[in-house]
């Protein structure tokens, strides 16, 4: 596993993930800034490139939902921030096969909140709306259905607090 900045100087899986996140940040920039005519063209270009990257990598991250320092470790299915009310904090590490979903699809559009410095293990399912605190580690193949406080380690299906950091 390489550092995300070092990945830009290599080819392969890490380059694709770095390119995905970089394109996502460009899309966020052109979405949020004042729209001049040429900015609309660039936003459309980065949106189409983002859609192509979703099909190519299997990762779906909505613009303006993820804080800085997102670290994607391997390619694989991830669905993060499909709604604008979802927020994933800074310096979050997310492994493959992570799914964010609703407990009940007919309930209102309440959001997720994932705090800063979180580690989300492979195969994790987070059914919300939930609030996950800062510095939380979620073990592999866990199912999170309830709020998690700051500074703890959770695992299991359903996820239970194993220990506090």
Residue ranges and their predicted role:
Residues 1-57:
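Terminal amphipathic alpha-helical/low-complexity segments used for targeting or macromolecular assembly
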Residues 55, 59-155, 159-162:
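Structural signal for interior beta-strand "rungs" in well-ordered beta-sheet cores
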